[in-house]
């Protein structure tokens, strides 16, 4: 039993971080990062900074990034990427649910990408994000979650118990926008669509709290002719629009 536990621990500590870094380095995720991450401004909290794949996409409007992640191996990779950039990065080796060592209303932008799926207590983590984010601040999220299509959602429910075990706690069936709004955030820009690949794993939910619609326009332009629809929610009017 000890050998089995050691193997699981080795996989989670050393192998899985490498798999995550490789899996998240592709054309589709890079396009999403390029459309959203440059919107970040000022003092940034990135929850689930992982291997630092967002770092090259931050603009010069960012003063500093506070990167939270419990994985020391992913953080080691991220530190190398941070050294190659010009933005100051303060790494916080902890879970997002824990009390963040940041003052209330001290952050201009919170960024979370493909991380809400795997945080054990996502509501508690979102409350921490809300605590540190300024009233006028922006929340930027790029996530995957529960599909609206019943046939796909059924498979997400079936696959998730095993998927969590091999994917570092990743849930395929979390309702991302519901989690965010339940934490008290007002989503002003929300898009939903499937990326290429198996649909239970690729239902994508990017969005933000803020009033800048440039990402919506840029994303629509970049996907023109792809045959995929991009839907957006204007939360101020509660209307779905296609951008």
Task: Give the label of every model feature segment.
Residues 185-196:
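Conserved S-adenosyl-L-methionine
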Residues 45-47, 51-99:
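Class I SAM-dependent methyltransferase SAM/SAH-binding core
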Residues 123-135:
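A short glycine-rich, Lys/Arg-flanked "PGG" loop and its adjoining helix->strand segment in the class I
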Residues 97-109:
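A short acidic, Gly/Pro-enriched loop at the edge of an enzyme's catalytic core
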Residues 23-43, 53-57:
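Conserved alpha-helix/loop element of class I SAM-dependent methyltransferases that forms part
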Residues 108-121:
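A short SAM/SAH-binding and catalytic strip from SAM-dependent methyltransferases
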Residues 136-144:
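Conserved beta-strand signature within the Rossmann-like core of class I S-adenosyl-L-methionine
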Residues 168-184:
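Short alpha-helix
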């Amino acid at each position: 039993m000890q050998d089995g536990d050691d193997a699981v621990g080795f996989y989670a500590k050393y192998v899985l971080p490498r798999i995550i870094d490789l899996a998240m380095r592709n054309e589709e995720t890079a396009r999403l990062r390029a459309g959203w991450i440059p919107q970040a401004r000022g003092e940034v909290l990135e929850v689930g900074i992982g291997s630092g794949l967002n770092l090259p996409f931050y603009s010069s409007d960012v003063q500093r990034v506070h990167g939270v992640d419990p994985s020391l191996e992913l953080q080691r990779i991220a530190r190398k990427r941070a050294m190659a950039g010009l933005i100051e990065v303060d790494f916080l080796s902890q879970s997002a649910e824990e009390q963040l060592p940041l003052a209330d209303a001290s952050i201009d932008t919170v960024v979370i990408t493909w991380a809400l799926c795997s945080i054990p207590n996502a509501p508690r983590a979102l409350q921490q994000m809300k605590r540190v984010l300024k009233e006028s601040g922006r929340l930027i999220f790029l996530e995957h979650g529960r599909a609206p299509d019943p046939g796909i959602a059924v498979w997400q429910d079936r696959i998730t118990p095993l998927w969590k075990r091999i994917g570092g706690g990743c849930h395929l069936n979390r309702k991302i926008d519901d989690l965010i709004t339940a934490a008290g955030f007002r989503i002003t820009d929300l898009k939903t669509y499937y990326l290429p690949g198996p649909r239970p794993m690729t239902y994508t939910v990017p969005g933000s709290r803020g009033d800048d619609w440039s990402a919506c326009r840029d994303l629509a332009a970049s996907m023109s002719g792809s045959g995929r629809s991009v839907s957006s929610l204007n939360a101020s009017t509660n209307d779905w629009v296609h951008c």
